[in-house]
Amino acid sequence: MACDFDITKENIYDYIIEDTPGADEAIKALSGICSQRADSQWIIAHGELPDNRQLNISSLGYFTIPKLYGLMEGDADISALDEIGALRVLGQDNLQADGSNVLIGYVDTGIDYLNDVFKDRLGNTRIQAIWDQTDRTETDVANTYAHFGRVYEKDEIDRAIEADNNGENPYSYVAQRDTSGHGTLMASISAGSYTDGYVGVAPGAELLVVKLKQSKQYLRDFFLIKDDVPAFEESDI
């Protein structure tokens, strides 16, 4: 059953179900439950939390509860690019190993799409799309690819970059921002363009970005995660 309510609300719980024979029919028979297929093996289901906000593990099964994931601790060391030989490989044009015709996916805290390291030589974005799961803005634009949040495609990102170049507000076109900087750092290391003496591993690659929303409070409570610690749901990833 498709979801006709806001699955991002705090009073909606999420769980992961293996698509065994009869699982789909069992979900459809439940009242107030909606589901969406993650792939050929897994189903993500959503329903209203009980009033006490406690998960009934005995009936649901621990494996159905989305696990929480955090960010890499500490600062990334970009000197590793040289140590793994990435810069030496890029210097050999005959290898054509700059990531051209490759699409790299990032599921993280978002990306600073205005940063020059994500643009090509003409100043256009190399980002093909950004799915901002945190975007709750009402819009008339159809969400073709996602059940919540907002998907921005390449032409919209280029429009935002052009606005920024003209002294306008780019975020009126593409509102997504990487307030943490973690996603931007990871993307720049792996796919940063040649900029001010810096280059990533695959400067010719295109990027596909997901900005994850923070996990719901009931899962933080269940796993004893502090409120000030970034945590992301397995079902969103």
Residue ranges of model-derived segments:
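Autoinhibitory propeptides
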Residues: M1-L103, G110-R126
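Subtilisin-like serine protease catalytic core
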Residues: G91-E233
